[in-house]
């Protein structure tokens, strides 16, 4: 009997699965006889329970298992016979109008879509390029110096000076204060502190608070009003105005280390050579720039491929990917130590758009790779593993680590395939180069 595949929509299909009841019952009886050999019931030795009692106890459960197995196998056989590329899992529902003597089920499912790849030559890609300048190295050195800042009491003489004659607090100073805040004369949680330290100008405190501390000298006090923003994280004070009194207890000025041999040694340059230090910084920035520009270009290529391709996306695959993203989000919460993260409700709907893009992109890439033979070659995978291993102390051990685990190797293979796709698209598309500074590149990729 020919299988009839009903077309319910662009991707949705339905087939009817029929199973003779006598064949099902025969399998049920066989499984119950096997079960009876080991089943335990009060008052009977193992394997000595009467078959009738075993049947009464387990017939329903065994029948459900047999039906599930046989329906699944027949669906698989039909899918193979009809060359159906099933996307996701089918849903089975019993039919009320089954032929007498048969069980009948409707299997509803989706199939993989036809992917129509557009002309890659019409894609437009803006390829970001970054050249590391001396100014960028200087900016990085400034950041590194600020990370190693240490503070000295303003006005007190020391090996690095006294910070200037002016002993009033100014931007960049680390100040220590006592403060008391009240709303309508009542203290509120978090509104009072002693020996509270912060750096003026860093933006850690609300602007009115920093403004009040600026210009104060040790021992001086000031009263001021502070309006909490409507979106302030402390809901009990958000949108309200508090009256604060602040007393300056300590003012420390920042001393940045000089760029000298000792500074270079602190960055891992053993002989303290400043030229080596700058070259090392340049190399690091160039590696980081390459990584970031590759990410930007890759995203542009993927966007371009989605734009020129036509396909319908199976809902089943989107739902599966939503669940994967939910689990990834949950694992992230667990790793960050969020309380009750394992049981936290994470609605799958919040990942709907992301999941659809991921699934659509996966289908497009699979078609492009197949059509243009862009699969990863073993030598490409090895070259990438070797390149990655170079940055470690024992590259050979890193290579062994990769090749000892198929999942890790599969991840590298996927990376190589993506690189092949990017190179292929760039060789065909309309590409324009855009020079940006490292700072602009870092800002753009941080927001992505």
Swiss-Prot record:
- Is the keyword Chaperone in the record? yes
Q: Which Pfam families match?
A: FKBP_C, Trigger_C, Trigger_N
**PPIase FKBP-type domain boundaries:** 172-257
Question: Per the record, what are the reactions this protein catalyses?
Answer: [protein]-peptidylproline (omega=180) = [protein]-peptidylproline (omega=0)
Tell whether Protease is among the UniProt keywords.
Answer: no
Q: Which UniProt keywords apply?
A: Cell cycle, Cell division, Chaperone, Cytoplasm, Isomerase, Rotamase
Query: GO molecular function, one example?
Result: peptidyl-prolyl cis-trans isomerase activity
Domain of life, per the record?
Answer: Bacteria
Please name the InterPro entries in this protein's record. PPIase_dom_sf (IPR046357), PPIase_FKBP_dom (IPR001179), Trig_fac (IPR005215), Trigger_fac_C (IPR008880), Trigger_fac_C_sf (IPR037041), Trigger_fac_ribosome-bd_bac (IPR008881), Trigger_fac_ribosome-bd_sf (IPR036611), Trigger_fact/SurA_dom_sf (IPR027304)
Q: Taking the first listed entry, what is the main subcellular location of this protein, grouped into a coarse class?
A: cytoplasm
User: Under which main EC class is this enzyme filed?
Assistant: isomerase
Q: What is its EC number?
A: 5.2.1.8
The record, for SUPFAM superfamilies, names: FKBP-like, Triger factor/SurA peptide-binding domain-like, Trigger factor ribosome-binding domain
UniProt function note: Involved in protein export. Acts as a chaperone by maintaining the newly synthesized protein in an open conformation. Functions as a peptidyl-prolyl cis-trans isomerase.
The protein's name is: Trigger factor
The organism that produces this protein has a lineage beginning with: Bacteria, Pseudomonadati, Pseudomonadota, Betaproteobacteria, Burkholderiales
